[in-house]
Each structure stands twice: as C-alpha cells, then as structure tokens.
Amino acid sequence: MALLLLAGCVVAGYWYWLCLRPVEIVAVHEEDNHASVLVKNFPLTDKGKINWWRKNKNLLKEKYNIPKPSSSGNFTIIFWLFGDGYQEEGKYDRRCFDDMKTKVNCIDKNAVFAVRKYHNDDIIFATYEGRYTLDKNSNIIKNE
C-alpha cells in the first residue's frame, strides 16, 4: 500500500512539474499570414494551451509581430514542438522552412496547437483533442 502511495505521489509530482515548466519559444517562421512557432515545454492540456495563448498573444504581437492577418482578416499560427531540433529534410514527414538558407531547416511534424481566424470571424483553436471557438464575448466553446 505504501509503495502504491509513493508511486502515486511520484506521478503527481512529475505531472505538476510538467505543467509548471515555462514555455520556450525557439523560433518563429513566417509566410504571408501564416506563422510557425517552434516551442519547447508547451502546455499539455487543451485548457492550458488556450490559456497560454490568451496570456501571451500580446507578447507574440510585440516581440514577433504575429499574427499578421491578410487583408480579409485571415491568419494561422501553428505551434510545433521543437523536439530534436532542426534537421535535414531526409525523413518524409518533416516541416521545412524556406526562410532558412541551410540544409538543416526542417523539424519533425509535431503540431500541438493552432490558432486560426477567418474573415474577421471568431478565433478557432485546434488541438489533438478538439476544436474550440473564442467568440466575440471571449467565451470558449468546444465545437462538436
């Protein structure tokens, strides 16, 4: 019983540590109204990802000048885990960035979060677990 309790405490402590690590923005790559943000330590839960966006969207605008909406108001920001860092294209499932003039300009495709806005409508959040809408009243609604 004590061993089970100890294991539970270790797992809870590890989860707590994972949730408290600060997000590190490694790089931002842009193409028109699309941006790819390479991150380490991104929040694990949908709620954590959306809350991180809401807390840091002004910092992203000030420091990286993203999002850059098109003339119709569209933009897309995709957050990718930086994982093993930049690599050569080699593997079939990598995202490469043409703004880097080197052969080592790709990452493994591991998108963890996306923020999209279409035609000045509501903002859409996309995660592995679902899609959410941030309406004009700042309410977050899970899409079915």
Q: How should these model regions be labeled?
A:
Residues 1-20:
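Hydrophobic membrane-insertion alpha-helices, especially the h-region
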Residues 12-14, 62, 130:
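Intrinsically disordered, low-complexity segments enriched in small/polar residues
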